[in-house]
């Protein structure tokens, strides 16, 4: 559906706040559907502590969008976006640099190209201004992990204080089918209620070896602005810091074994690591109390010392950093609309997704649906078999009590029908084929190709 100036003149502009990856994608998708857009970006009027330029879509961390191969979760997500006509992914493809099996970009040329595309679109007005309140009318919030204080306060007032977080302290998540079920047992303490936890029992020797590895592992250094804002770290001690406080700190804390019996021995273990179910299907499991600041490679090495986790597949590593994000299961629909105000949408890291491609995906969906609201067209909810559909289904329906940001991963997708596929490579290839077929069946790919 190409843009039309004559039709656009009769429509009120949609306001997109934030010129990162999500906001840039949202603005482009809205304009491509023929609806005028105001894109507000506060840089350079007000600089964030992490950005260095005034360019749109500036990559403040790595220059990599993750795996290229479409039989990897990040690669499948990008392939879906390619087929749906994503500006950001097309720009990344054009400015790619050699990076093995990943899509990495020349970050300066990439953000320059995005800025020029937005500035030159006849239906997009780029405003360099700080937005301090929630806009009226149809609007999309894409303000990212470092949302400015005035707008964050406005969001708190709109959503309720308890539904906006300023600090991300996430524990790692592993896949259920990668656990050693000969060691791991399912039980709740004192057999109370449902056996909702998986338990990894430790002997004294295993516990001591784990604690030693934990305190010796390499940590991620805090950014300067995170050091200055230590209040975000209070009351949420990394597990490696707890281990440094003494031999018994962990086993009287998150690793306490009370009320649990190892069925292999018939007695209480010396310590226990508990895993909590993260999704309805029981495919993803969270290491309870394992918020950590260890480097990702170190997390994999150290946490695989836990009995039962020797071959654990990590779909998300633990992080501790400054991150403004919504309690999306409480607030958002799978269309990325706010439940209490359907003309307001959100996308990017603000909604609790992790990674560049996930931010782009949110921008695509929020932009499409904002434009469709303006045009009186049916809104899009993507099929759960697609990576995009499963991601936004998850963030809008996860347990709000334990919600933490989530990256794209195959654990979010529905199980394959028929006989269980043991080969991981074949299973992922089938996930990919099913996802792309489901996406094609929506007709959205055909629309993107003719736009």
UniProtKB/Swiss-Prot annotation:
GO terms for molecular function: flavin adenine dinucleotide binding; tRNA (uracil(54)-C5)-methyltransferase activity, 5,10-methylenetetrahydrofolate-dependent. It holds the Pfam family GIDA. The keyword Transferase applies. It is an enzyme of class 2 (transferase). InterPro entries: FAD/NAD-bd_sf, MnmG-rel, MnmG_N, TrmFO. It is found in: Cytoplasm. GO terms for biological process: tRNA methylation; tRNA wobble uridine modification. Keywords: Cytoplasm, FAD, Flavoprotein, Methyltransferase, NAD, NADP, Transferase, tRNA processing. Its cofactor is FAD. GO terms for cellular component: cytosol. It catalyses: uridine(54) in tRNA + (6R)-5,10-methylene-5,6,7,8-tetrahydrofolate + NADH + H(+) = 5-methyluridine(54) in tRNA + (6S)-5,6,7,8-tetrahydrofolate + NAD(+); uridine(54) in tRNA + (6R)-5,10-methylene-5,6,7,8-tetrahydrofolate + NADPH + H(+) = 5-methyluridine(54) in tRNA + (6S)-5,6,7,8-tetrahydrofolate + NADP(+). FAD binds at residues 18-23. Catalyzes the folate-dependent formation of 5-methyl-uridine at position 54 (M-5-U54) in all tRNAs. Belongs to the MnmG family. TrmFO subfamily. This is Methylenetetrahydrofolate--tRNA-(uracil-5-)-methyltransferase TrmFO. It comes from Synechococcus sp. (strain JA-3-3Ab) (Cyanobacteria bacterium Yellowstone A-Prime). The lineage of its organism: Bacteria, Bacillati, Cyanobacteriota, Cyanophyceae, Synechococcales. The gene is trmFO.
């Amino acid at each position: 559906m190409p843009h039309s100036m004559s039709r656009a003149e009769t429509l009120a502009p949609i306001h997109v706040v934030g010129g990162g990856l999500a906001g840039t994608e949202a603005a482009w998708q809205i304009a491509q559907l023929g609806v005028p857009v105001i894109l507000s970006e506060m840089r350079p009027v007000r600089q964030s502590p992490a950005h260095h330029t005034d360019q749109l879509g500036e990559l403040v961390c790595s220059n990599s969008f993750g795996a290229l191969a479409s039989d990897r979760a990040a690669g499948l997500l990008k392939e879906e976006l390619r087929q749906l006509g994503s500006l950001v992914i097309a720009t990344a493809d054009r400015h790619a640099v050699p990076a093995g099996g990943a899509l990495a970009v020349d970050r300066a040329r990439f953000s320059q190209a995005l800025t020029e595309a937005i500035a030159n679109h006849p239906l997009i007005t780029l405003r360099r201004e700080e937005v301090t309140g929630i806009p009226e009318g149809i609007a999309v919030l894409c303000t990212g992990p470092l949302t400015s204080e005035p707008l964050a306060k406005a969001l708190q007032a709109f959503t309720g204080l308890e539904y906006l977080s300023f600090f991300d302290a996430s524990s790692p998540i592993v896949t259920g089918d990668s656990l050693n079920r000969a060691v791991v047992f399912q039980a709740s303490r004192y057999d109370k209620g449902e056996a909702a936890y998986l338990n990894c029992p430790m002997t004294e020797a295993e516990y001591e070896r784990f604690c030693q590895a934990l305190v010796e592992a390499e940590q991620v250094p805090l950014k300067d602005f995170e050091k200055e804002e230590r209040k975000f770290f209070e009351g949420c001690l990394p597990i490696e810091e707890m281990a440094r406080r003494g031999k018994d700190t962990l086993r009287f804390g998150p690793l306490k074994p009370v009320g649990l019996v190892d069925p292999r021995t018939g007695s209480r273990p010396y310590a226990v690591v508990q895993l909590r179910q993260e999704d309805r299907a029981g495919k993803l499991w969270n290491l309870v109390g394992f918020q950590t600041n260890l480097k990702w490679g170190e997390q994999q090495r150290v946490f695989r010392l836990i009995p039962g986790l020797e071959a654990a597949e990590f779909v998300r590593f633990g992080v501790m950093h400054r991150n403004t994000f919504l309690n999306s299961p409480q607030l958002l629909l799978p269309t990325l609309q706010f439940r209490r105000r359907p003309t307001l949408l959100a996308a990017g890291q603000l909604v609790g997704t992790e990674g560049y491609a996930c931010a782009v995906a949110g921008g695509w969906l929020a932009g499409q649906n904002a434009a469709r609201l303006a045009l009186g067209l049916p809104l899009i909810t993507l099929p759960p078999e697609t990576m995009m559909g499963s991601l936004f289904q998850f963030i809008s329906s996860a347990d709000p009590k334990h919600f933490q940001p989530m990256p794209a991963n195959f654990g979010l997708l529905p199980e394959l029908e028929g006989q269980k596929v043991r080969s991981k490579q074949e299973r992922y290839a089938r996930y990919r084929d099913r996802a792309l077929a489901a996406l094609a069946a929506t007709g959205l790919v055909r629309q993107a190709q003719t736009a």
